[in-house]
Amino acid sequence: MINLKKIILKYKYKFLLVILLIIIISLINTFLPYIIKQTIALVKSDVVFHDIKQKLFSLVSVYLITTLICAILEFLKSTILAKNTQDLIYDIRKTTYKRIMDFNMDTFSNMHISTLVTRMTSDISNIGEFIGRTLPMFLSSGVFLILVLIVMSFVNIYFAIIMIVSSIFLVVAVLKIGKKMAYYKKREIEITENLNDYFGETFSSIKTTHIFNIQNERRQKFIDYSSAELSMSTKYFDSQSILTPVRSITRYFIISLILYLCLQGKVANIDIGVIYLVVSYIDKFFEPLGNMLYHYEDIQKGKISMHRIDELMGTDENIENIYQGENTEKLYGNIKFSNVSFSYSNKKSILENVNFSINEGERVALIGETGAGKTTIVNLILGFYKINSGNITFDGKNIDDISLESLRKNISFIQQSPYVFNDTIKKNIVVNNENNFSDEKIIDILKLVGLYNKVTNFKNGIYEIVNENSFSKGEKQLLAFARAIAKDTSIYIFDEPTSNIDVKNEQTIKNIISEVLKDSTVIIIAHRPATIENVDKILKVQNKKVVIKSRKNIVHINNSEKFT
């Protein structure tokens, strides 16, 4: 099983180097105020300036050199950290995308597209921010706080105790308020995801929204989601706003208390240099604390996003291994269902003890009412889902023994609503076999399906970059036929192949099925009898079973056609 922890651990040595640099830089930053303290003590002494000139020059030189070294180390740390973080994020995004591509259809059917988009964009960016900026800042701040407390204990143990007690007070406050902040941030992210889902639904259903005049209802629902998001965000920042004054009050209280103790003579052996050192360390002590409070939101976002990416990667049960099984070079189209039963995600049964066979080279119509299970049978043939019981065989081989890569390589599936990739027309036809097709062969296929004239209207011909909006529904179906012909398989499955096509092109498609694919096994999901002229067999799906019909069962009633 792949998880986020394994990916991060691949970079552990690179990040250990960053941690080492953080510790060295923190040590240097702790040492710098001490140099200034020594300089102040030297200047304030009764010694003549000429006598301390050499020592003063040495202290200033040490300070400048140390500062320069610190700057160089900071540069190295930032460069290494940025490179490591970018490599890590690239690795996470690449691994996550591969994982999504390997999901089985059952997993996809239970997920929103916007959820996947959010995981691949916002969540991975949050992880990058968390690992590349927030976590190093917290580590640096934590190391520096410990070093400051150690040095302060040597300067004056009472001062160190005061700072430790104050730190405990601040930590308790942060944890108490932070618990609420974590809840508010989690709810805000969940609501934002719902809002993203709603955006996608809004744009997909825009025509329906206008047809039924429900713009106001949709608008109100958007306002409800936005208001809920605003409410959680406001509560989060209200809680966060309490932390800053708490930090400031604690800081000023400590400085005031220490100065008071010094002025009242409660602390022995305190000079101006020591007071500077103490005040400087207090400032430096609260600066990282302030950073930690200010970036507390990033911790919450990072933790939530890491959990969500881990959830997305899931377990191996969600994964479809297309290479598992026998690599069969050619399937001839002998398909047999034996006592097949199936239900989606253990829900209501769709098919029960289904039995039928399709022979090599047969043309078979798959008919039935909407929701009867026609598409389900096709999904099972394509290996998108595992059956609950029974057997499906191809040329006598069990479907589970054939690799999905081999299975799908031998089947062309023409969907009712084909997808057009944002790529060239040629790439949209050959998909993953571009090197084996000359331009002339692609043009011949376009002429065969009746799309050639359309393509000649494009400036770059078959190399024109197209997308979903470049073709009408009917033209998309013709493009899908071109894909199927280019794939050149032994089994073809058509989902209502002429539903979006005019009469002229409908006849073209029928000719292709009859002539071009005459030696192939053809399965046609059909709702109209005209679609399945010249088929050899009709399989009707009804009552979770498959009944074998003949073409004589197609009757004409009042110039309309229906299946019986």
Feature-to-residue mapping (PLM):
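An intracellular "coupling" helix at the cytosolic face of ABC transporter transmembrane type-1 domains
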Residues: 9-12, 105-106, 122-131, 135, ...
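Transmembrane helix-loop-helix hairpins at lipid-water interfaces of multipass membrane proteins
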Residues: 15-73, 153-158, 272
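Hydrophobic alpha-helical transmembrane segments of ABC transporter permease domains
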Residues: 20, 73, 121-166, 247-258
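Helix-loop-helix
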Residues: 46-47, 151-165, 239-307, 312-313
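ABC-type nucleotide-binding domain
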Residues: 52, 329-564
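Alpha-helical transmembrane segments of multi-pass membrane proteins
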Residues: 66-85, 132, 136-143, 164-188, ...
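Juxtamembrane loop-to-helix connectors within ABC transporter transmembrane domains
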Residues: 81, 99-145, 232
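Short intracellular "coupling" helices and adjacent cytoplasmic loop segments at the cytosolic face
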Residues: 86, 94-118, 122-124, 198-221, ...
